[in-house]
């Protein structure tokens, strides 16, 4: 454990302090116990697997939830940006910014209708500060009486962030602030975090954002570990620990083998001594009492040796079990991808002057030309609303072009961030059999086991799964049939995943030997997939991306 601070759990001038805090889920399941942490004017990221309690920890910090045990102390103001918020139908821009009432007071005064109290309370710099905050998040000239619900999800996130800039809390708490945002909005969030004058506590799987923090809190069922530095330094230390865990496992396996051999040899020696002792006793002329005493001493000596050997064996087995547990925590997300058998020269996709229209004759996309050959990897980027999801549906064959043609001579599969091919009320076995109707229940269980849904896990219902589990289940269903798809189309697959799950998906897709078309705003994800080219969808046209 390390930190930039002399005491990583207690930074100087703490704004929020958690002392011996415990948290439970509504059904009583424990998330963490006896957690002691402090957050000051540094930038802190909280990482950990889905379900470990990251959002719960943020809510405790922000004062939105109370701990089951322990205490939370706050000094100064705290601002909260939730992962997803649905505005009321009549909520305006001014409401979301938190300035509706002071703005109304200012307008009454400016119109000459204000009371003496209005005159005293009027904030004469409010409109200027509001416009500056909106411009800072890319929403310049937004009318304060416009409905918030008319904005896109990404624009609403920007708007709430502008409200926080206006409020200027001492501590900013952000839960997955870059989810569903395009590259430009993600960069804006990262700049806000990097430049925030107070403290920041955030949960995110956006590795570019995690590089902007001063320390990382790794949350698990065992508690919290605090690491100084940003994401890259954290990964370096984590990977070193994982390599050490693998070495410890190898040593533990060798040690248990050595103890087993030594125990076997000791038992054989003792058996030989026992046989020799019995033979000597039978041929001895010594008094019986002396022979009995010698036999008892030999028996006690043998028993001591057996007890010592048993203690060694138990210690070695305990070390082995501990080493296996450490490694299993790392290995448990390793996925196995079957080969697609795609030849290098096979044409996988050919868009020839393809056009997609909506609402009658309004052109959304096209004319589009795109050719994929062999196991080529293509990333498609572009701002939200550009039509990327529609393009992927066209590529996967879920929609047809209004004009032009789409040639797709291989089997294709589309995986979106919701894993929509799966139905919430079906079990994983049922879903696999529905998507692979020629298969058997035994084949379904074997296939799901390759993707870590073993035994009773295969009987779980889709609606019970986390985002990462749903994507893993969808991969299992499409990749383990009789004919795995030779073209895999991915639409923002890393949304809703924790970082361990993202890295597991990256590793699995890196081993995929078919063609790949992926839409993602996660630059690290695209880089780790080692795509051959990146195309930008802009104004309905595909063109080489100028983004490095």
Predicted regions and their residues:
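Conserved beta-strand
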Residues: 18-21, 30-42, 70, 351-357, ...
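ABC-family P-loop ATPase nucleotide-binding domains
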Residues: 87-153, 416-487, 492
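Hydrophobic anchor residue at the start of the ABC signature
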Residues: 161, 189, 475, 494
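Conserved beta-strand-loop-alpha-helix hinge in the C-terminal portion
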Residues: 90-95, 222-247, 537-548
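ABC ATPase nucleotide-binding domain signature region
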Residues: 40-44, 55-117, 215, 375-386, ...
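Coupling and communication elements adjacent to P-loop NTPase active sites across diverse families
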Residues: 1-24, 102-157, 237-358
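Catalytic Walker B motif of ABC-type/P-loop ATPase nucleotide-binding domains
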Residues: 172-176, 181, 415, 487-492, ...
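Conserved D-loop/post-Walker B switch-helix segment of ABC ATPase nucleotide-binding domains
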Residues: 182-191, 495-507, 524
């Amino acid at each position: 454990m390390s930190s930039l601070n002399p005491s990583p759990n207690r930074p100087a001038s703490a704004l929020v302090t958690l002392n011996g805090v415990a948290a439970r889920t509504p059904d009583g399941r424990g998330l963490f116990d006896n957690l002691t942490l402090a957050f000051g004017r540094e930038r802190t990221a909280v990482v950990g697997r889905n379900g470990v309690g990251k959002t719960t920890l943020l809510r405790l910090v922000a004062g939105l939830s109370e701990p089951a045990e322990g205490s939370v102390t706050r000094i100064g103001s705290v601002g909260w940006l939730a992962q997803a918020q649905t505005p009321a139908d009549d909520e305006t821009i001014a409401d979301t910014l938190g300035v509706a009432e002071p703005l109304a007071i200012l307008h009454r005064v400016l119109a000459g209708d204000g009371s003496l109290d209005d005159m005293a309370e009027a904030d004469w710099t409010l409109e200027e500060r509001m416009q500056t905050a909106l411009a800072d998040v890319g929403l310049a000239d937004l009318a304060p009486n416009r409905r918030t619900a008319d904005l896109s999800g990404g624009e609403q996130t920007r708007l709430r962030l502008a409200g926080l800039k206006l409020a200027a809390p001492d501590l900013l708490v952000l839960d997955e602030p870059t989810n569903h945002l395009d590259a430009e909005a993600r960069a804006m969030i990262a700049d806000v975090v990097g430049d925030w004058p107070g403290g920041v506590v955030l949960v995110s799987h956006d590795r570019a954002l995690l590089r902007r923090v001063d320390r990382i809190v790794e949350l698990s069922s065992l508690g919290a570990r605090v690491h100084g530095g940003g994401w890259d330094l954290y990964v370096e230390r984590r990977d070193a620990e994982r390599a050490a865990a693998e070495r410890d496992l190898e040593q533990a396996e060798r040690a248990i083998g050595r103890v087993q051999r030594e125990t076997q040899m000791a038992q054989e020696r003792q058996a030989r001594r026992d046989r020799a002792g019995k033979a000597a006793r039978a041929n001895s002329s010594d008094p019986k009492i002396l022979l009995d005493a010698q036999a008892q001493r030999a028996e006690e000596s043998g028993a001591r040796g057996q007890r010592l050997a048993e203690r060694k064996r138990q210690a070695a087995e305990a070390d082995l079990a501990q080493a296996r547990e450490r490694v299993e925590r790392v290995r448990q997300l390793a996925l196995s991808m079957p080969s697609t058998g795609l030849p290098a020269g096979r044409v996988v996709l050919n868009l020839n002057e393809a056009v997609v229209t909506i609402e009658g004759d309004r052109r959304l996309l096209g004319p589009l030309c795109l050719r994929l050959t062999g196991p080529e990897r293509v990333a498609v980027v572009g701002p939200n609303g550009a039509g990327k999801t529609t393009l992927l549906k066209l590529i996967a064959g879920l929609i047809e072009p209004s004009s032009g043609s789409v040639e797709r001579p291989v089997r294709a599969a589309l995986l979106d961030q919701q894993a929509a091919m799966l139905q919430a009320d079906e079990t994983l076995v049922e879903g696999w059999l529905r998507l692979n109707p020629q298969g058997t229940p035994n084949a379904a269980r074997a296939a799901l086991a390759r993707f870590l849904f073993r035994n009773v896990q295969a009987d779980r219902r889709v609606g019970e799964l986390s985002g990462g589990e749903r994507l893993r289940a969808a991969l299992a269903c499409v990749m383990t049939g009789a004919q795995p798809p030779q073209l895999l189309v991915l639409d923002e697959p890393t949304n809703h995943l924790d970082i361990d799950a993202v890295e597991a998906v990256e590793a699995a897709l890196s081993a995929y030997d078919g063609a790949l078309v992926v839409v993602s705003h996660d630059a690290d994800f695209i880089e780790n997939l080692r795509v051959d080219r990146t195309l930008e969808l802009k104004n309905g046209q595909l063109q080489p991306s100028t983004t490095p």
